[in-house]
From Swiss-Prot:
A single GO BP: translation
Name used for this protein in its record: Large ribosomal subunit protein uL15
Keyword Signal tagged: no
Lineage: Bacteria, Bacillati, Bacillota, Bacilli, Bacillales
HAMAP family cross-referenced by the UniProt entry: Ribosomal_uL15
Taxonomic source organism: Staphylococcus aureus (strain NCTC 8325 / PS 47)
Ranges annotated as biased composition (Gly residues): 42-52
Stretches with biased composition (Basic and acidic residues): 1-18
PANTHER family: 50S RIBOSOMAL PROTEIN L15 (PTHR12934), LARGE RIBOSOMAL SUBUNIT PROTEIN UL15M (PTHR12934:SF11)
Length: 146
């Protein structure tokens, strides 16, 4: 096979369907929009959530709760994720982001006690669960709230 003999796989290249170009194409005249009506008009159509005049679902259901503008969301790191670091490492939020353990810091890092810790580490984070702090100290490491 030579370069000039290359062809795309069968069925992989499909020409787009041009509507309104004659009755013989199968998509002429009304261009697949049916006859008259709101959806046949240019720019026509109903807004999202519109149910034809029936009271829409979002208005039938009661309002509930509120959004706390002061809410802080912490990036969560479990103990077993800290095992990837060498013994004696100082684990900081910057190191966690750099090594890909967390994608971004959000409002801070919280260390939780899921899994087991096998290394002696100095961990600096914004929050610790009681079990996580206990496990870090039990291995001879240290935890520091920043």
């Amino acid at each position: 096979m030579k370069l000039h003999e290359l062809k795309p796989a069968e069925g992989s290249r499909k020409e787009r369907n041009r509507v309104g170009r004659g009755v013989a194409t199968g998509n002429g005249k009304t261009s697949g929009r049916g006859h008259k009506g709101q959806k046949a008009r240019s720019g026509g159509g109903v807004r999202p959530g519109f149910e034809g005049g029936q009271l829409p679902l979002f208005r039938r259901l009661p309002k509930r709760g509120f959004t706390n503008i002061n809410r802080k969301e912490y990036a969560i790191v479990n103990l077993d994720q800290l095992n990837k670091f060498e013994d004696g490492t100082e684990v900081t939020p910057a190191l966690l982001v750099e090594s890909g353990v967390v994608k971004n810091e959000k409002s801070g890092i919280k260390i939780l006690g899921n899994g087991s810790l096998d290394k002696k580490l100095t961990v600096k984070a914004h929050k610790f669960s009681a079990s996580a702090a206990e496990a870090i100290d039990a291995k001879g490491g240290a935890h520091e709230v920043i």
